[in-house]
């Protein structure tokens, strides 16, 4: 796992990249508990089951949209930005890799025809005018 911290405010986690070939444990929580967008990687064997459950409704306050891309097919070049809007890192994601942006900006260049990604972000989505600002 690659964690990208701010050069402007060291100690602030901006972005994270996890590669498919790094999965080794049965369960790994790969995001710090204080982030709004949470992710665990589960490596499971045939026959594994879970107890049926549902999640508790509770009010939570979020102050930023955090986003993740999972590459399903193809490849993507990620440009990650620091909190001062300067590029801090460039990373290429291949099939089954993922990126997470907690703070700072990002941009993506699609490298292969018919690339497919899943995009996850914290909600609720209130429209583009309340979600992002261009760098």
Predicted regions and their residues:
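Conserved short histidine dyad/triad with adjacent acidic residue
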Residues: 23, 41-63
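Double-stranded beta-helix
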Residues: 4, 8, 107-135
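A short, N-terminal "cap"/entry segment at the start of jelly-roll beta-barrel domains
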Residues: 1-42, 91
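Short acidic-glycine-tyrosine-enriched beta hairpin
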Residues: 82-103
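Short beta-strand His + acidic residue motifs that chelate non-heme Fe in jelly-roll/DSBH
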Residues: 52, 78-80, 100-101, 106-112, ...
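Glycine- and acidic-residue-biased ligand/ion/polar-headgroup-sensing regions
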Residues: 45-46, 64-81
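Conserved hydrophobic/aromatic beta-strand scaffold that supports enzyme active sites
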Residues: 41-43, 68, 90, 98-100, ...
């Amino acid at each position: 796992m690659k964690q990208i911290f701010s050069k402007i405010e060291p100690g602030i986690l901006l972005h994270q990249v996890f590669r498919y070939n790094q999965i080794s444990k049965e369960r790994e929580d790969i995001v710090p508990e204080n982030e709004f967008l949470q992710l665990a990687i589960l490596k499971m064997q045939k026959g594994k089951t879970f107890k049926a459950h549902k999640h508790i409704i509770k009010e939570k306050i979020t102050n930023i949209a955090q986003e993740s891309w999972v590459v399903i097919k193809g490849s993507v070049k990620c440009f990650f930005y620091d909190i001062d809007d300067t590029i801090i890192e460039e990373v290429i994601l291949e099939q089954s890799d993922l990126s997470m942006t907690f703070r700072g900006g990002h941009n993506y260049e699609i490298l292969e025809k018919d690339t497919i990604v899943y995009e996850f972000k914290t909600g609720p989505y209130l429209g583009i005018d309340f979600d992002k600002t261009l760098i």
